[in-house]
Amino acid sequence: MQGLVFFLTSLLVFVFLFCALLPIASPRMTKPKMATKEVTYTYVALGDSLTEGVGDSTKQGGFVPILAQSLSNENDGQYQPVNYGVAGNTSAQILDRLKKQTDLQKDLKKARVMTLTVGGNDLRKVVVNHLSDFSLSDIQKPLKNYTANLKEIITKARKDNPHLPIYVVGIYNPLYLNFPELTSIQTAVDRWNETTEETIAQFDQVYFVPINDLLYKGIDGKMGVSEISDGKTTVINDALYEEDSFHPNNTGYEKMKQAILEKINATKKTWSQK
């Protein structure tokens, strides 16, 4: 019996000493999480009244700020918009600003992406000058001049940023619902957009965003809304600003934003690594 007690006592002492000699495992080292530094990208919006945001009841700049917000929400980093839209500008006037505005040049140098609305005032000027007898032949020379200006705008915008992705927004026909019989104007709009798309196809990472089909028939292409006053029926394009029936309203700008965003999402893999 004494032998058994001695044996058990010796065993307990041995186990205690063995455990005491074992190294104590140190806590697992965890790599501290580094605070991610949020990157800010510059988004340059250049153009005419569509870029300025005429018709936007919030006076915030039409599609520009909501596009920047969507880009920030869907990508890493924050997209900070700088709006260089001036209502009434033709392609020649936009080009002139591009040559002279040093702040615009500086922003383009560091820009991550650029949108361009151009051409609508060039065509509008032709239509106004030939309102009673407008024909497609009237746009030949202005379209040629516009094409030359568009090429130079793209080239100068990339002077210090050669891989800058540029999204050129097409023009639309705001007169269609009230003057559907003026088919020559719609044909001119189509031809203008086709020429724009053909012209920018000569450049790498310059993309065309068509918007005519989104706006010229009203929301969802439902031919607008009819209003009757003094026995006369007026068709209202519910995608356009009521005050002038020419520029997009908030809904119209939302549709523009979505079209540009979808084009960016479909093409950004070609430029996101540059």
Where is each model-derived feature located?
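Histidine-centered active-site loop/cap adjacent to the catalytic His
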Residues: 232-274
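Surface-exposed cleft-lining segments at the edges of enzyme active sites
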Residues: 87, 130-145, 178-185
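Substrate-gating cap/lid alpha-helix
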Residues: 174-213
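Oxyanion-hole/transition-state-stabilizing segment in secreted/luminal serine hydrolases
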Residues: 96-141
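Hydrophobic membrane-insertion alpha-helices, especially the h-region
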Residues: 6-22
